[in-house]
Amino acid sequence: MAEVRTARSVWTGSVTEGGGKVTAVTSGTFTDLDVTLPTRSGAAEGNTSPEELIAAAHASCYSMALSAGLTRAGTPPDSLDVSASVTFDMVDGAPTVTTSVLSVSGSVPGVTADQFAEAAETAKNGCPISRALAGVEISLESVSLA
């Protein structure tokens, strides 16, 4: 059965002077995160952005995909540390998410650096958020701490 997760954004005012509030409706884990255009395209000043939320989704989804793959192979990780950096840029005059750079380090007993890199790449390609971002260049840096 398909799972549906819902977030809501309420925006007031013009795009340049107004602002929005983003809430996780399904889980309720965050409410009223501030978003504005000036902080989206400049200094964050305590506000989030759609791109930061995409980065959070990508990092968390990828860590689950990598953990699942390693566990299926009989080598569950002791720990994984994943970050995703999403780039928002102008392409042909249109604002566009252009890249998501994943960086992962992990401690996985019994796994060589080459095996870790292979598992990391497999997870990058199989992660549902990676697949959702199919039009975005996704790169990966992996480091085995074992």
Task: Place the predicted regions along the sequence by residue.
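Extended beta-strand/beta-hairpin segments
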Residues: 1-56, 63-146
